[in-house]
């Protein structure tokens, strides 16, 4: 069956966005939605810009990520307007003229200076819901970020359109290409920096393009959850490799983690295999009506069961969870929403009118507490780590007998394990976006 084109998918996506915007504006009492793309600004006491990052509310409408000082304007009943800043500039590369599958669906105006946008924005700024950062202020058009508008739009962003799913799949393909190159570099004995460069070259993206800083962790560095130091020399001996790295596709992110052992016959490889199999089962439980908080708790029990089997825990999974010992080995959340942002918004939202669903007690780093619904895309990223600071807390809290410390010492040189896929909640079985791409790569 032929796949729909991005142009047709975008047309449907735009209808969804305009319907959402109509409702959001009605709730907020505004007549126009105005979204600046964001602006560049200097670093403190310097004449160099901070790296530009596009406003996520802007790239939801159009697949443009490097167009500072541009604007999106939507008025109910009218086509979206894109005010596209294309300066006369011989110091920097100027954005190409708008092109692609989206241009026929919007009214596009080219401006040469930022203040030319004033003549194209709605006449009455006070009637506009302006979603952006303070630096985007232009004349009377000051971002006001009205809460009823944001609450509705951000809540609805959890439900991905077919167009968004198509772009998320492209982001998966790019990232997996990088992951394969990174694994090969690890097997060849490269340093963290060398592995990182191999990844970027394979994906075709650098630090300004990637959705987040690559985590390239060899040996004990795998115990640092967000390790981004990129050592220049490979450690000796080389034992393990944890990579958490994604890619960007037209403003949408992927977020994938894999862990490798240098010795395929080691106990660490066996532990990786056990966590990998458990992670796959966790992903299959992403179903409509399931509370993500419960998935997180179930992940704790599953991982502690593995540690018990490997002789690392001496108590039951339930006891490890109840006493907080499990959090020493699995100290982060099971995952989060993903889309325009790696940690996509409204993970705690109680409804499209606001409110908050709190995390379970004792689990302060879980980033998603909602009940799953069709269209949501979530990460499933269980992990097991050997972190001195957290293991010391186990001893201080009187639970040293819950752990076989000799087994812990044997695994500490490997740092930790994390496996992460992206999974779509559907009306039926879960759809894993990541595994099929690895299988085909």
UniProtKB/Swiss-Prot annotation:
InterPro entries, A to Z: Creatin/AminoP/Spt16_N (IPR029149), Creatinase/aminopeptidase-like (IPR036005), PepQ_N (IPR048819), Pept_M24 (IPR000994), Peptidase_M24B_aminopep-P_CS (IPR001131), X-Pro_dipept-like (IPR052433), X_Pro_dipept (IPR022846)
UniProt: Mn(2+) 1 binding residues: 255, 336, 381, 420
Pfam family, one: Peptidase_M24
Co-factor remark: Binds 2 manganese ions per subunit.
Any one Gene Ontology molecular-function term assigned to this protein's record: proline dipeptidase activity
EC numbers, comma separated: 3.4.13.9
Residue positions binding Mn(2+) 2: 244, 255, 420
PROSITE patterns recorded: PROLINE_PEPTIDASE (PS00491)
Cofactor: Mn(2+)
Biological-process GO terms, alphabetical: proteolysis
Presence of keyword Isomerase: no
Reactions listed under catalytic activity: Xaa-L-Pro dipeptide + H2O = an L-alpha-amino acid + L-proline
Entry superkingdom: Bacteria
GO cellular component: cytosol
Record key words, sorted: Dipeptidase, Hydrolase, Manganese, Metal-binding, Metalloprotease, Protease
PANTHER family in the cross-refs: XAA-PRO AMINOPEPTIDASE 3, XAA-PRO DIPEPTIDASE
Family: Belongs to the peptidase M24B family. Bacterial-type prolidase subfamily.
HAMAP family attached to this UniProt entry: X_Pro_dipeptid
Name this polypeptide is given: Xaa-Pro dipeptidase
UniProt organism field: Xanthomonas axonopodis pv. citri (strain 306)
